[in-house]
């Protein structure tokens, strides 16, 4: 469970990134956050795992305050809170397997991880994670040799290697084509269902949000202006969230319905 209690974020220049956010996200939910660029979507996700420091309020993950946590306790909470980025954040010169193993860094000492001395069970866990996203055959390839879709699936495998209770995905499909977008979202949704991992995803495309979410949260200028099930997320509601009618580039379109064939090759 994630509890966001009256959270605000004010930047040094006075800009309000978040305004009095109150949300409770239950274990196993698949939540999609939508809103215009600058609405606070990334700020919210980065505040949950404390990549951003909030100005007011408190955030609890599984009953533990990440806002107040320090040292070992903070590291332990972050170990269980995996982040997936739009830009993949892989070490391109390293192998796919080594990138996935970086998800285990929080469980070991610095020297051991620098020297790549991961125990056998960690290697097995990393390989299993790659298999779950259908990219096991690329384990010993350089990350730089992979397509964008393959790199994002490596990032998902890295998140899985953390054995998280929460996955935060910040625009994970923004740089991908429609077919690969569906494959990546299918992976995230399947993992959410199978492992009951609480998943929060920031998305640009409205139809994608409707297809995958169990709950949609709409942000506008740092405030929650919609929070409800997909059935209530009408075009009119999205127009309220965005402050204007839906535009064509906010819909992925019919290509979303193409069969996700050749999954591992994209």
UniProtKB/Swiss-Prot annotation:
- Gene3D superfamilies attached to this UniProt entry: P-loop containing nucleotide triphosphate hydrolases (3.40.50.300)
Query: Which Gene Ontology MF annotations are present?
Result: ABC-type phosphonate transporter activity; ATP binding; ATP hydrolysis activity
Q: Does the keyword tRNA-binding apply?
A: no
Q: What is its main location?
A: membrane
Spell out the SMART domains in the cross-references.
Answer: AAA
Domain ABC transporter span(s) in chain numbering: 2-246
Keyword list (alphabetical) reads: ATP-binding, Cell membrane, Membrane, Nucleotide-binding, Phosphonate transport, Translocase, Transport
Supply the EC number(s): 7.3.2.2
Q: How does it sit in the membrane?
A: Peripheral membrane protein
Q: Reaction(s) catalyzed by this protein?
A: phosphonate(out) + ATP + H2O = phosphonate(in) + ADP + phosphate + H(+)
One protein family per Pfam? ABC_tran
* Coiled-coil portions: none
Q: Which domain of life is it from?
A: Bacteria
Q: Where does ATP bind?
A: 35-42
Q: Using the chain's own numbering, where are the disulfide bonds?
A: none
What is known about its subunit structure?
A: The complex is composed of two ATP-binding proteins (PhnC), two transmembrane proteins (PhnE) and a solute-binding protein (PhnD).
Give the family this protein belongs to, as stated in its UniProt record: Belongs to the ABC transporter superfamily. Phosphonates importer (TC 3.A.1.9.1) family.
- Relate the protein's function as given in its record: Part of the ABC transporter complex PhnCDE involved in phosphonates import. Responsible for energy coupling to the transport system.
The protein in question is named: Phosphonates import ATP-binding protein PhnC
- Gene of origin? phnC
């Amino acid at each position: 469970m994630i509890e966001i209690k009256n959270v605000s974020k004010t930047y040094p220049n006075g800009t309000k990134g978040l305004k009095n956010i109150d949300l409770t996200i239950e274990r196993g939910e698949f939540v999609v956050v939508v809103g215009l660029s600058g609405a606070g979507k990334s700020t919210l996700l980065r505040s949950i795992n404390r990549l951003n420091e909030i100005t007011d309020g408190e955030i609890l993950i599984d009953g533990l305050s990440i806002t107040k946590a320090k040292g070992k306790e903070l590291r332990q909470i972050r170990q269980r809170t995996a982040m997936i980025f739009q830009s993949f954040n892989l070490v391109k010169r390293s192998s796919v397997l080594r990138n996935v193993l970086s998800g285990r860094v929080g469980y070991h000492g610095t020297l051991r991880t620098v020297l790549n001395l991961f125990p056998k069970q960690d290697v097995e866990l990393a390989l299993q994670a790659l298999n779950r996203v259908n990219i096991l055959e690329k384990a010993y390839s350089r990350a730089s040799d992979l397509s964008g879709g393959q790199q994002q699936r490596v990032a998902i495998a890295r998140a899985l290697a953390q054995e998280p209770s929460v996955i935060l995905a910040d625009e994970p499909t923004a740089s991908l084509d429609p077919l690969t977008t569906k494959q990546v979202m299918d992976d995230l949704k399947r993992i959410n269902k199978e492992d009951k991992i609480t998943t929060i995803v920031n998305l640009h495309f409205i139809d994608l949000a409707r297809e995958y979410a169990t709950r949609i949260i709409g942000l506008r200028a740092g405030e929650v202006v919609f929070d409800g099930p997909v059935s209530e997320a009408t075009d009119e509601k999205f127009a309220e969230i965005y402050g204007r009618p839906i535009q064509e580039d906010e819909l992925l379109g019919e290509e979303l319905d193409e069969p996700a064939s050749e999954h591992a090759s994209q």
